[in-house]
Amino acid sequence: MKKAIIAMSGGVDSSVAALLTKESGDECIGATMKLYNNEDIGVHREKTCCSLDDVEDARSVAYQMDMPYYVFNFTADFHTEVMDRFVDAYENGCTPNPCIDCNRYLKFDKMFHRMQEIGYDYIVTGHYARVEYDEKRDRYLLKKAVDDTKDQSYVLYMLTQEQLAHVKLPLGGLWKDQVRVIAEKHGFINARKHDSQDICFVPDGDYAKFIEKYTGKKTPEGDFVDKDGNYIGRHKGIIHYTIGQRRGLGIPAASRLYVCEISPKTNTVVLGDNEDLFSSELEADNVNLISVDSLAEPKRVTAKIRYRHKEQPATAWQTPDGILHGKFDEPQRAITKGQAVVMYDGDEVVGGGVINKIYSQS
């Protein structure tokens, strides 16, 4: 009999993952990560991810299954590894994905180490993706979920071989509707609970307001300029903008203007036409490869540049310094620094990294 820690968010997915694991005969405990206090984010919130209501829902489901349940306090780590990185990225003109950092540094690092400390064998999550072992290649593979509308392999690209060997994802072969039916059949309190949509610590979606409250300082205003450096107007501070943004610029113009570039060094935001947003080539650091050891030779892949982006044909390779390069067959709109680029070979995740450079079309 194996021993499993079920990472329970309070949602229906992790609850059904817990049920399926327990029904397999393994010894299970449920655990929810405590990531912050409400006062940390300056709001009273009960209805979004990681809230007190979520803890109570997770506890209810665990007790219903006669499964021990714990809350792991990772608040200090969450501040350092997720919130601080989120703020730093925006202040440096990037648009981060904090869910990936949470997986990288908390769920599959801190909780992974907790699993090892207590002598358990693996972690179970409610992510929609699949982990398989390939005997011929002697490596673990991360694959897309059967339900492509819910596939979350993109946010798991950072998993290492050691981690994949101790991770189980029971929902990878199920459709979301099937998961809800299972939850309803067992009378789970969260069977029809809505999926969380917001960044958990910015529930109102106002990233700039959160950053200014978190840092205790107001971001300095600066200039909007065109791609030739000509002055257009004043902006409210670079943390208010992301690549491709059109609304909220406050600039009267004869044609639509979009945020094309953010320069923290000069505190300027470059505005341009929609066509200025397209580019074909990027570089990424913080690289993790799963299906291969390296990309020393160019490899044909499909690639995503954000979670909701439809994969596009591309060629991927690494330079000797480990930097990941991706060149799309066709120009892509609004490739953004700070977002992850994830490469696929069919349904296998080849690997990915954090975008840190975009090559101009010109």
Features from the language model and the residues they span:
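AMP-forming adenylation/ATP pyrophosphatase catalytic core
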Residues: 124-362
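ATP-dependent adenylation/nucleotidyltransferase module used to activate substrates
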Residues: 1-157, 168, 178
